[in-house]
Amino acid sequence: VQKDGTVIDTIKVTIGDMEKDYVSYTCKGELLDMKGVQIPKNVYNYDIVVKKDDKVYKNLSLTRWSEGTSGYSFSALPGTYQFYYGENKIAEITVTDSDVVQDLTMPVKYIKIKMYDAQDQLIPLTQQVTLINQESSQQYNLYGDEDSVDFSIAVALPLGTYQFETYEGMPSVQGKTITVKEDTDEIVMNMNVYKLTGNCKINGESADRSTWINLYRKEETSYLTSCAVDEEGNYVFYLESGDYSVQVSKADATIIAEEEVSVTNASVIQDFDITNAS
């Protein structure tokens, strides 16, 4: 017998009529970090297994893209349920004859990361950020929030030391580490980088997301990173001092423009106004 895609009972069918009633209730709550702080939905990336009678009753996949508001919710029959996050049992909830509201305390710490460039300007991390836990080698793909104004990115992670793997907008962040501690609410990182930004127009119109900006180190002629322009044709990188080659290419990798840029001790603007591009 299933309800909302969840197996709630198994019955044996024999000869003759059978009737069995089920009364279910709602079990719901918010997700809290280990200090009792409510975890915002935009940092969710959790798979929680709910068991009943030593069997999997429900798999809760909670991400920033999940439907509804924050927290968890599912239909439950009367009984006792155990909640697991990885190998950790994080809660046990008993449903009797009414709805249950109980928050789940996750074995993670919610922290805001503030990253500043060499001119003490906050760097917004709006693209995917990849972190690797140095003890477990577990990879975490995180996403910044474009509406964030007082921090670069927020995370809710298990305690430990993490290494930045990739961030296409700032190549030099790779290899940097942060340590998530229970008594830490904020991490400040001072990066020796400067902002390179610009706008790209093609035949008088703002370039679309099929247009890519490719970055090379001039002295090494080696590929460094790339990004697609946004809806208005804008792009942004955060770079260490040096000389760079900036290329504009189409989705098929055809190069339609190229400029050389020197990043010294200030932010740089490099716009492109490309004509006769098909």
Q: For the regions a protein language model found, what residue spans apply to each?
A:
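Short, acidic Ser/Thr/Gly-rich low-complexity loop/linker segments typical of extracellular
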Residues: 51-71, 132-153, 217-234
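Beta-strand signatures of extracellular beta-sandwich domains
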Residues: 47-49, 128-130, 212-216, 247
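Short Pro-Gly-centered beta-turn/loop motif in secreted/extracellular proteins
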Residues: 64-82, 146-163, 168-170, 234-245, ...
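A short, amphipathic beta-strand motif
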Residues: 27-33, 111-117, 196-202, 272, ...
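Structured interaction patches on ligand/partner-binding surfaces of diverse proteins
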Residues: 1-19, 84-102, 107, 167-187, ...
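A short beta-turn/strand-edge loop motif at beta-sheet boundaries
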Residues: 36-44, 120-125, 204-209
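Hydrophobic loop/turn residues within beta-sheet-rich immunoglobulin-like superfamily modules
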Residues: 18, 75-77, 98, 107, ...
